[in-house]
């Protein structure tokens, strides 16, 4: 989830997992409702789901792995205030247990203050974090992963989307 970058990040995660040979179900706010497809899913399959604040408002369960790309004032015509919007977004990790993974943008003032119940990993374009940029290369835990010049989708924000995806797929892809 996030204010911006949800669809791109969800798609990147899905493609990274598929490239590793995983069976991936992509859906949610991205256009495909997954609920009707759950009977076709196998226990070893992975679901990558884009969730909006509206979908998260009443959620009482959280996924094992969650990403919050960034948060900024959004949908305030629907939410009574910014705090209600932020609280809805927090539901993506609020119910994780100690084995959960939460991925957050350290460069966003709101998400930088969040902490999960399990492991919390940060990505940052501007400073040191678990996933950061060193000499033009996205690095995860100090190891080079991807030169930023190889990212063909234009825009600095898409570097952040890649960083979020690279962080959350750790342990699932080589």
Give the label of every model feature segment.
Residues 80-83, 90, 119-174:
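Adenine nucleotide phosphate-binding catalytic loops in nucleotide-utilizing enzymes
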Residues 1-106, 110-119:
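Phosphate-binding loop of NTP-binding sites
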């Amino acid at each position: 989830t996030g204010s911006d970058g949800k669809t791109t990040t969800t798609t990147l995660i899905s493609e990274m997992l598929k490239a590793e040979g995983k069976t991936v179900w992509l859906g949610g706010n991205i256009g495909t409702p997954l609920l009707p497809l759950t009977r076709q899913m196998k226990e070893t399959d992975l679901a990558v789901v884009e969730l909006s604040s509206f979908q998260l408002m009443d959620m009482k369960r959280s996924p094992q792995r969650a990403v919050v790309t960034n948060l900024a004032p959004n949908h305030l015509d629907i939410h009574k205030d910014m705090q209600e919007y932020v609280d809805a977004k927090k539901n993506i990790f609020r119910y994780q247990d100690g084995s959960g993974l939460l991925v957050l943008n350290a460069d966003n003032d709101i998400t930088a203050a969040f902490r999960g119940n399990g492991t919390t990993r940060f990505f940052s374009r501007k400073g040191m974090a678990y996933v950061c940029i060193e000499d033009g290369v996205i690095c995860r835990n100090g190891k080079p992963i991807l030169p930023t010049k190889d990212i063909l989708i234009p825009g600095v924000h898409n570097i952040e989307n890649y960083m979020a995806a690279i962080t959350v797929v750790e342990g699932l892809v080589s």
